[in-house]
Structure formats: C-alpha cells, structure tokens
C-alpha cells in the first residue's frame, strides 16, 4: 500500500500593510513575512511527491505579487489570517494538494490553515 507523504518548503516576502480600524496596526507598517507550505501526495516512481524546486517555484509565483507592496491594495483587510487564506487558495487553484500554509509576521506571531 502506498502511503501519502507530506513535503514542505519555506520562503519569505517583505511588505507593508495596515489593519483598518485597529488601534495599533491601523497605521502603515511593514514585516518580513515568512511563509511555510506543505503539500501531500503519493511518492512517484522518481522517488518524490514533487520536486522541491518545482514546489518552491510555484509558491514563489504566488508570493511574489506581495513582495515589496502595500498589501491593502490586494487584500481588503490584510491580516495574517487573510494573507494565509489567499496563499492557500491560490496554491490550491494551481492544482496542489495543500495541507498547510503558515504566514508569520515575525518569530512569535503567525496564522496557519490546515486541511
């Protein structure tokens, strides 16, 4: 029986945002966001679920549109949660069997979705 395997990569982007109506984060400020993505699938004959380079390329295509931008221009309320949901959705639309996406604003604040 073939087992399902989980693989993952991490990448990052820098961006600014403000959270409308938030007392502290309502002003434009920036973060160096870290993004972690995990996908799952069967190990193919080549010994891989997916080539890490291909996975990183696809994730970077999605994340690149956020790099060095004002996130409010792309996501109405650009919380870490909504950024995470957007990345998850766009990766799923590209046909990846996404298991987990984590978006971290810094070392001690992040949002994560798992399926």
From Swiss-Prot:
Output the superkingdom of the source species. Archaea
Q: How is the cofactor bound?
A: Binds 1 zinc ion per subunit.
- Cited InterPro entries: 6-PTP_synth/QueD (IPR007115), 6-PTP_synth/QueD_sf (IPR038418)
> Which residues of this UniProt protein bind Zn(2+)?
17, 29, 31
- Spell out the molecular function terms from Gene Ontology: 6-carboxytetrahydropterin synthase activity; metal ion binding
Instruction: Report the pathway entry.
Output: Purine metabolism; 7-cyano-7-deazaguanine biosynthesis
Record bears the keyword DNA-binding? no
Instruction: Give the EC number(s) listed in the UniProt record.
Output: 4.1.2.50
Miscellaneous note, as given in the UniProt record, is: The active site is at the interface between 2 subunits. The proton acceptor Cys is on one subunit, and the charge relay system is on the other subunit.
Please report which protein family the annotation says this sequence is part of.
Belongs to the PTPS family. QueD subfamily.
Protein name per its UniProtKB record: Putative 6-carboxy-5,6,7,8-tetrahydropterin synthase
Encoding gene, per UniProt annotation: queD
